[in-house]
Amino acid sequence: SWDWQVFCKDTIDGEIVPRCFGGAGDVTYLDWLLSAWGWTLSVSLLALGVALVLGSIMGILRTAPHRGWVLLGNAWTELFRNVPLLVQIFLWYHVVPALIPPLRGVPSFILVVLGLGLFTSARISEQVRAGIQSLTGGQRMAGLAMGFTLPQTYRYVLLPMAFRIVIPPLTSESMNIVKNSAVAFAVSISELTLFALQAQEETARGIEIYLAV
């Protein structure tokens, strides 16, 4: 039988806590679950912000008329898209701080946000590029003919139409980034995956734990 009171138990002594929320230093599994949700959403939202900014910039560069910018955007996209996410997280956590000493004091939370954000930026770059290239060439020429500079043409003509086209895949990507945030458990960030793994080991109530997650 299911035992939903598992979330009202103290994580130390296993005693049931009234009203399921710990106090005076006590932490219940419900407290832990809510904290894990907070970590997951924090990682996901911050990484999504990083990915949207960098991905949009790289997507624009890949459609620019200058070959150097195109090469930079393509190199960025291919690098971060083709290296597995878990490998990138380990590189940011173990290798990059060793190569750049000032980063040794950076919290693992920030490093995971950067790793997940850069990985997702490559995917968003591809979507933004496809959205811009789906527009007819006359849109760019019309903007330039009206006296806009190239940056103004992108800002006022191309990007508003392109982003309307790529809203569906961007919505899908925002859901993917929440799922991908599970890799944070590999560097001991107490998000939902780490909570589920540890809580089921301590309580032997895997079904209830994973249904709540």
What are these regions (language model features)?
Residues 1-213:
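Transmembrane alpha-helices and adjacent helix-loop boundaries
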